[in-house]
Amino acid sequence: MIELCSVEKVFGQLRAVDKLSFKIFQGEVFGLLGKNGAGKTTTIKMLTLQLKPTAGEIFFEGRAIAGNEIFIKSLLGVVPQHLNFDQDLTVEENLELHARLHHMKKSARRERIDELLKFVELERVRKSFVRELSGGMKRRLLIVRALIHRPKILFLDEPTVALDPQVRRKIWELIENLKAQGITIVLTTHYIEEAEALCDRVAILNRGKLAALDTTENLCAGRTLEEKFIELTK
């Protein structure tokens, strides 16, 4: 479980995140929604230890971040919005490099890479250079890379941005399969229907504050999630 307690982040005169308090439960798909500038990216960066909160605390499995950074980082897999592969390495070489960064033994690296490439149906392109892959393949490869060290928590920042509907559905299937394996998933998305389809609960942020937090069913209450989102973020 992840718990945020009165978390704030201030940049100069800008209060990007304002006293956020909520819990993310083990094994759920948790969505963070909000307009541009609502605080989603800043919140994700604090949850993935890329930024330190100005105030408040974040707990992972009951442990505060301070003094537990190595343990907490071992729990996390992060899929960024922007592609950050070495385009001149092959699929296999990129994954091998990342596995080494996690100090995985050679036999374990091989086994895990084979397992994950099969899982996301990228076995046939393992020897291809990353620059040769389609956008959908690169998105799936980002997910594989984040899963290489068997994290318990996976952060997905806009995982289907700029993908066509068919490829987006394939990513959705991957996320559903990961949830079935018991992995906790935290995702940000601009696609309201994506949150509605995938998330057990959704937090809607507005101007750095928590505007709503509930299941998609309870948030909608006879309306669409998009209508509720528009109402809360005016």
Q: Regions from the language model: what does each represent?
A:
Residues 96, 100, 107-125:
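Conserved ABC ATPase "signature" region
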